[in-house]
Structures are given as structure tokens and as C-alpha cells.
Amino acid sequence: MNIAIIGSGIAGLTCAWRLAGHHQVTLFEAGATPGGHTATVDVATPQGTWAIDTGFIVYNDRTYPRFMGLLSELGIGGQKTQMSFSVHNPASGLEYNGHSLTSLFAQRRNLLKPAFWGLLSEIVRFNRLAKLALTEALDPGATLENFLARHRFSPFFARHYILPMGAAIWSSSLQEMRRFPLPLFLRFFEHHGLLDIRDRPQWYVVPGGSREYVRALLARLGDRLDLRLNAPVQQVDRHPTGVTLRLASGEAHFDQVIFACHSAQALAMLAAPTDSEREVLGDIGWQRNEVVLHSDPRWLPARQRAWASWNYRLSDGDCARACVTYNMNILQGLPADAPLFCVTLNPDAPVDDRYVWQRFVYEHPLFNPQSWSAQLRREEINGQQRSWYCGAYWYNGFHEDGVRSALDVVQGIAAAEDN
């Protein structure tokens, strides 16, 4: 068959990798660079040039089996990294990093604070109750806030631990985390070892930057894939005998189309979406997130002992977007003499231009009861009218989910052929 793939993120690339040997495949990318959220930047400094990741950064050996399988097929091994998490409250001055006892009490006065000891006690209690809840039937409509209220967790615990951690993971505000679907939240935390003090998965980065797997995949595909960059698809018309893609350069005709882009983008391209497509794709919301690559240490905790891989900065109120600074020196294992590299998501104040290397905008899916219901209706639209939908937003929003959703589509196309 002649198949069009729209979007060159992890989902689109996985579809291309699996289909290009058996079908005629054309991959359309609106931008100048393939990879989607896999975005590695070369930063030239007096100490040399450094490849720094700004989008997709880490994966682990427990919950990324499909992505690790893809890397293995490409001959790419992982580089071990440290995953740690800190919280800094500029209003109160509180900061801690849960990686070790030294970093946990980087702020020595916390040793004398009953509220801080209470926080540690509530973390243990939350982990225990979360595991217990997972052994029972979970209400699909329950939210994280319902769980916190039912078990009477303190506002201090919510604002200084569980909500910031969730907000950092899903790039959401604290308010959005309160509405987060409880089943999805608890299962994610369990699968990632976040309900345990020990026995956590080993995390990895791609050596040389995450773009290396994109380069390897495209090199291996070679001329089996027709990759078209700077080629935004304006409209998709579907008819009984095929699919027509309309671009600035003209029209292109295919037997099937795979939308490996965001749900909102896919819906906007459809010339005549069905009612189900409008409902399902339209119910998955997206949030715009600003990202700054810089070298300003003021976005990390004041005490270097508290510096973590992920550093959450609390703002007043719950509505502000998640402000997280990734310490790329820790995450990418840069040598001790390397300059400091930080990637800050949604800075809550201007980052000093003297330290800024580059700025980006990414969009991330919003997870709430509405999107949770939409995910469950995916099969209503997948494979209908020669159209297929994949992307990390169909599951938990991470690289593994992009691969998983793509493999769903590949299997669906194979099954449709057999019929």
C-alpha cells in the first residue's frame, strides 16, 4: 500500500520503521528537523561544543520495553543517569532533594521542623495507601484530589510533594494535577517505582543526545522512506478509493493515512471529520509550555546539596504552569569541567538573557477525566475511513507510549490487510 504518515515524532518514526519495508511510505514533517519532542541542541562554549537535550531526555529499564527494543534494533545502548527530585519554595525558603539523607536535609533547619518530619511521614503513608488502593476496584471517575481528601492528607504534603511531583512529570499546573485521573496516576507511580523508597528502575539517556536514535533510524531506512521536511499538511480529504493530502506544493494521493501528530492538529486537518472524531480528538486538550535552555544557577535550589535532576519551583497559588528546571549536567553525565546547563520549563520570571542559549515552545497533552474517557474511545475512530491515529497522548504521554500507540496502528493495518 501507499501510506502517508503525518508527523515525525517518536510515533511517526516508529510507524515508518515498521512499515517502510513492506509498503511505500511517505513521512510528512511540518518543521525543518525530524524528531518531534526529541530535540538536541549543539551549544558552543569556550570549553567546547555540547549536545544538550531539551525535549525527550530519559527512559528506564522497567516501563520502556518497546522503546528499549527499538533502540536495540538500532544498535544504540543506554547511558546510566541519576533521577532525583527537589522542591524549592521561594516564599518560605524551604528546599529539599529526596535523593539521599544529605540532600534531604540540605537545609539543616528542616531537622528541627515538625512540619518537615510530618511531610516524610505522609509520603510513607501515601505510598502505603496508594498500593492498597491498587488492589481494589478504582472508580474510573476518581481524581487525585478525591484521594487526598478522603485520606486527609495535609495541604503541606499536597503542595510540597505529591502535586509538584505529578506536575513535573506531566508538565501541568498543581490545579490540573488535582483533577488528574486517579487510576492513571496511581498505576503510573506504581509502574515507575515511585511508591517505593527502594527497588526503583534504572534510568538512562541516549549517549550523545536523544537525536542520535532519530539519526540512526533514518539512516537505516535510507531510500525506503520518502521523508519530506518543511511540508505541513493543510487538509486531508478521505474518499472511498483513497486519501488526498493537500499541501502548499500541491496534492498527494495515498491508500491510508496515519496521523502521528497531536490530536488537535489531526482534527484541524480533517476536511470532513465524523462526529466520533470530533468528540474523541476534541476531548484531548493540550497545554503550551515554554522551555528555556540556559546556564543560570539561580533557577536551581539555593544550596548546591539540594540540586537534583528535576527541580520544581513552587509559585503562589495552584493555577501557575509547572516551573521545573532540569539539571542537564546531572542527567547527561557531563564532565565536572563542563559549564552548567539547565532546561527550565515555564519559568515564572524572565530568565536573564545573558545566560540564555535558546528558547522553545512545546505542547503537552492534558490528562483529566475528559481526556481519560476519550482515550477509551480510540477504537471508534482508528482504522475508519482509511485513517489511523497514534501518539503518546493515547496513553501516559511519554516516549514509550508513542512507540506503543504506533505499534497498535501497525498491527491494525496488518490485520486490516489480512481481512
What are these regions (language model features)?
Residues 2-27:
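N-terminal Rossmann-like FAD-binding beta1-loop-alpha1 element of flavoenzymes
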Residues 11, 33, 264:
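Conserved Rossmann-like nucleotide-cofactor binding loop
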Residues 20-44:
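Glycine-rich FAD pyrophosphate-binding loop
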Residues 41-67:
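N-terminal glycine-rich dinucleotide-binding loop that anchors FAD/FMN and/or NAD(P) in oxidoreductases
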Residues 42, 99-100, 319-419:
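Conserved flavin/dinucleotide-binding core of flavoenzymes
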Residues 61-182:
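Mobile amphipathic helical/loop "lid" adjacent to a hydrophobic cofactor/ligand pocket
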Residues 187-247, 252:
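Helical element adjacent to the flavin cofactor pocket in flavoenzyme catalytic cores
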Residues 232-363:
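Mid-domain catalytic core of redox enzymes
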